[in-house]
């Protein structure tokens, strides 16, 4: 990392519904700015510690509600990174539905990509961002992607994924996620496949650095 003596790191917020392509967009930004000092910070890492709850209680939690996240910790650690201080990033265990005992040591970088479904819901988080991006993708495509991801990567069953989508993911998207589109500086249709939007975004970041 080369510390910028004239300003703090640049923070890019990437949000959108579950399965919208946020990770693809974040990775595309990361790859296009590969000559820079970057890191990706995912909101999913900051789900609440639920180790004191039973497994049945954990299953009943609405993971698509803002209160499911330890936003205070996320804000604290972003501020540490903005001050060029390292952090111990939490690790979330998707199979146990709680935070792992492990952490990941993360050194500060000149560009911080913050990714998550609800990162624009909290004004304190928005105020830390230089550029805010909303990835806008059709509902049908998002649910198909979520089913494929959760079964393959998170050990979920088809019934549990569909049940969660209908019970919480879809209604919470319309209640909390979609309204945050108004805070976005850039709305990206078609996610990471939108090369024009990615080029515009990375050009803007280079102009700030």
UniProtKB/Swiss-Prot annotation:
Keyword Mitochondrion: no
Single GO cellular component term: cytoplasm
Enzyme Commission code(s) on record: 2.7.1.48
InterPro entries assigned: P-loop_NTPase, PRK/URK, Uridine_kinase, Uridine_kinase-like
Record's catalysed reaction(s): uridine + ATP = UMP + ADP + H(+); cytidine + ATP = CMP + ADP + H(+)
Domain of life assignment: Bacteria
Pathway(s): Pyrimidine metabolism; CTP biosynthesis via salvage pathway; CTP from cytidine: step 1/3; Pyrimidine metabolism; UMP biosynthesis via salvage pathway; UMP from uridine: step 1/1
Gene3D superfamilies per the UniProt record, alphabetical: P-loop containing nucleotide triphosphate hydrolases
Keywords, ordered alphabetically: ATP-binding, Cytoplasm, Kinase, Nucleotide-binding, Transferase
Keyword DNA repair: no
Record protein name field: Uridine kinase
Annotated source species: Lactiplantibacillus plantarum (strain ATCC BAA-793 / NCIMB 8826 / WCFS1)
Name of the encoding gene: udk
